[in-house]
């Protein structure tokens, strides 16, 4: 009787049980050394000693997918936003020099549709596999009246580890370091409030539209390209001492995020035009009549991550990154800063 009354109030615990049944295989596929236990416990367990670190420092990160979820829900395509939420968290801890160990997800919804939410969690599991992290727990909260029946929100939390003497700090990068940019897959998971205003409020763009600028892709397909996860390509370089700094290009674009990886005594000089800008950004700039500053301050503009590497190590770093499947661009360098802003972007024809 209690269960029925709870269902009458809008919460179906049996749907929750069905969701757990559907995701067990996906969760199990993310197991890695150190993972302890199984899905369904009150807490997720991880054995740090099993990894053999000498002086481990734990690095944590949490994030969400933001209003990119509105695009996914309108398109009824929910299988890649889980990759996004993992990427947003694990790329952040990578910027400190850490290896992601485990991940937990949080889904809040107006109505628990087990098939739909299972597709979300399967995306989370795929992101965890790309990052080498175990999905050790999570929470699904069915909250009628808080969310519409067809709405859900998604957030996540990760913990990584680094040797204490391998941590990256703002004092690690040096003047003369070369800046290597790693290609993004598109908009990633930031700037979608501006994207939605441009396309759907200021203009009557449809997600199914295929403008010539996108070369055969629909607007929705281009916007939902999952955030790239850089762990398996960048972490080996960090462990080999080839990287002085990492900037994950998220909200605030290049202008805000590049200066976060070095101290106030340095300045990043970046050559715009030295990398490939994905078509989606040129399309958004044109439709939205955006200035260059609007773009630099909002979007990643084709660079999902920027590494500061010693000049005498750049060719070795490039070779390893290319071998791991990354598109790599030499986009600038660090110099001594006497005054002015910490980042300067100049156009190179």
UniProtKB/Swiss-Prot annotation:
Transmembrane segments: none annotated. It catalyses: 2-formamido-N(1)-(5-O-phospho-beta-D-ribosyl)acetamidine + ATP = 5-amino-1-(5-phospho-beta-D-ribosyl)imidazole + ADP + phosphate + H(+). Its EC number is 6.3.3.1. It comes from the Bacteria. One of its GO terms (cellular component) is cytosol. Keywords: ATP-binding, Cytoplasm, Ligase, Nucleotide-binding, Purine biosynthesis. CDD domains: PurM (cd02196). This is Phosphoribosylformylglycinamidine cyclo-ligase. It comes from Lactobacillus delbrueckii subsp. bulgaricus (strain ATCC 11842 / DSM 20081 / BCRC 10696 / JCM 1002 / NBRC 13953 / NCIMB 11778 / NCTC 12712 / WDCM 00102 / Lb 14).
